[in-house]
Amino acid sequence: MLPWGVIAYGAALSAVLAVVLVAVIGRQRSPGVLVTVAVGAFAGPVAWNAILRATAATQFFRDAPIPVFPVSWQDTGSGVFALATLAVLLGLGPLRTEPGRRVALAALLGGLGALLVDVYLY
């Protein structure tokens, strides 16, 4: 089970990578968008890992036997929770007047950042 310090560290790294991906690939430069991405990419993994801690769900931490992409259900959950959190926050917040594909791309890039950090960095 991950300690709270590790969860916070991983979520902070997720937020940083999500902001970089959204700024570089998604070409979003608005401070409001980038702050929202950081908040969502931090909050999603924290929420998911809090659920895993509260339920002592250790079986979610088994990595797939794929050396180049050893993803686990825990990693996947962090990405999915970040994606969902970002879709809601961005869609109701700073990107509410943008086309849905821009909201979806920004949320997807943020979720991807959370997934990659989870798989490779903690």
Report each predicted region and the residues it spans.
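Juxtamembrane/disordered regions of integral membrane proteins
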Residues: 1-35, 39, 46-122
